[in-house]
């Protein structure tokens, strides 16, 4: 038979025949024989020939080597040229393949026909197959196993053979091998799933819930129950196969190829007569999957089988995607029964973490303390609001363990310091070796001794580090062995091989347990000796540190230096804010409450309204607070309320509603706080905003949360909310200077506030703080602060600036205005100090490195270079 008509062959079979020519040319042979085709079949990636031989118990590597040996023994041409000829053996083999096609009643010659034809190939096939104990009967049995009772009716039938093996993952097999994580709790959901699966029709549960609550884990839990026999009779011995939609769609380049693959999977499930339960994770992907022009989507292929109860299928998807895809297709929706999977409580999450702890300890080779598990559940629930338990708590535990493992494998700090010191001294020694004077020789001698001591210390530390690492590795290795033995014990108990189970449990397992106890004892002795370089237990501090890295919220316990800093918070703020003792005290107390862990966890850290005339330090205090908390005064969310004077501008805070431009961008306030939940949020000049804007802030002030235009809940529980306003500033200016009128002034200001703001808004604010107008002596302190800032700018040129008391009084007088507060001082400093100084620098009167003294003469500032005459 001449292989010149590709329409007689399936795609894969024709590919192998075409490749035969290349194989012959590679080996410099001109005649195409059966061995060249055999090699081409073996070389196919994931090919059916390889699968048939593997199932027949043949080692493919050895088979490949044997074929190559045979080809290499055949005659070779020094210059084979371009043309190749069809050999007699290959021609006969293709005729036999045609015979097998007719025998099986297929439309095309397929790979399995070619493989069977080798059984009667006198030149090569019979000899090779005999070496590997194969004959036609054995090959036919394997082919029957692979293709079942399917016929070759298309040119790509190989993709439909063993389709469940190709496009699915056997969860029950993984459970048998102990490769699935234990599933703790979720009994109610698993029971409801089993109940639905036991129905006669529409026996298809769909698990719906938020991402990360454990929907896939329920399917894995069911697989584990099937393996352990803890299911009703209708599910005993069944297989649970997870369908991989990605693999099913990938590479289906021709129209109808995807449907063909899916149909093959569904046929296999149907023919199993209830022995296979299909699990489709992210089931919304089947709606519209593979639907090209004129082709049917996967959802429509599933519907008839789901309705008749021929296909038992478990789906899993999130609430949003269920609503978006499944609910729109009412016919598909009614074929599934909903099982709602809720987020577990913090207590349930702790139980789940305790169940998973051992797996993570074995994987990372560290120990995880119980307090760390509790901290992971509690802190993730409190501080990570946009994700769900138990997923976020498991991630925390996993990352904390990974971080500790990384520290164990990295060089310890003590050893690193010694290494750096040795390197430094080595460089110094090289330098001193070139000197010949007595002092250098003396120093070199001392250095050699110091270097010898350090190298001894380095050797000792290295040995200790290696010893500790070895013990930790040993503990991990023993734990892994125990894990494997436990899986073997479970397997033996399932097979009722009680002798094997007892032998493992009371022999191997107890021996491993003794080894583990000895290694643990050795490790704890090393660590309690006080000389330990490594830490191998994850604690709650590690969890708190990871939370801080994720969110920017300081959760870790206060170290002594930070405690000291917080106790002196008032003094820190007063370094920037002059006067306003009451305001600084109230703000400091709020931050101290929060960091001590005594603040209400369901409200913002604090919310204030700062009232007072312009230029008295309202915005400056907010900046000082941001600078204290984040070491950067710009690290605050600043919303200028004068930009929100129209009613519709509220959408800029929380995001535009659906259908409007900018819907996807989110709001200026919500996005900023979502990215940085631990923040100072400053609403500047709130009286300028439209009244409806404050309705948005009611939930923020009361519950510490707000829902943006996308439906996301933004958490403000770790934010300090500060609002500034000039309302009532006339009363403050009139009465604020005199303490005797303080109560009267406060009453007038509060009346003005009640006229402008609604009671439900004012009632939710923690404190309304009134900033007093500034006295002359306070202005002098502000001048000194401003001069210090000017000195920082001059420091680049190494110029020092000194002012006499008279000069400071002159600037205070020039900038004093009770109505405008401290702002005119900036202008006075600029006009009376900065401008003349700039002129002097440009003229060359002052140079880099000078000390400039400013005094007053004839009621004007005079600039002197110290030890020189006045220059301005």
UniProtKB/Swiss-Prot annotation:
Pfam families linked: AAA, AAA_2, AAA_lid_9, Clp_N, ClpB_D2-small
Repeat is among the record's keywords: yes
Disulfide bonds: none
Positions of region (Repeat 1): 9-74
Record keyword Cell cycle present: no
Chain spans, region NBD2: 562-773
Annotated GO CC locations: cytoplasm
Binding residues for ATP 1: 209-216
Protein location: Cytoplasm
Domain Clp R: 6-149
Segments of this protein annotated with the region Linker: 344-552
Major subcellular site: cytoplasm
Residues annotated for ATP 2 binding in this entry: 612-619
Sequence segments annotated as region (C-terminal): 774-872
Keyword annotations from UniProtKB, A to Z: ATP-binding, Chaperone, Coiled coil, Cytoplasm, Nucleotide-binding, Repeat, Stress response
Coiled-coil segments: 394-528
Function noted in UniProt: Part of a stress-induced multi-chaperone system, it is involved in the recovery of the cell from heat-induced damage, in cooperation with DnaK, DnaJ and GrpE. Acts before DnaK, in the processing of protein aggregates. Protein binding stimulates the ATPase activity; ATP hydrolysis unfolds the denatured protein aggregates, which probably helps expose new hydrophobic binding sites on the surface of ClpB-bound aggregates, contributing to the solubilization and refolding of denatured protein aggregates by DnaK.
Domain notes: The Clp repeat (R) domain probably functions as a substrate-discriminating domain, recruiting aggregated proteins to the ClpB hexamer and/or stabilizing bound proteins. The NBD2 domain is responsible for oligomerization, whereas the NBD1 domain stabilizes the hexamer probably in an ATP-dependent manner. The movement of the coiled-coil domain is essential for ClpB ability to rescue proteins from an aggregated state, probably by pulling apart large aggregated proteins, which are bound between the coiled-coils motifs of adjacent ClpB subunits in the functional hexamer.
Subunit structure: Homohexamer. The oligomerization is ATP-dependent.
Record-stated family: Belongs to the ClpA/ClpB family.
Name of the molecule in the record: Chaperone protein ClpB
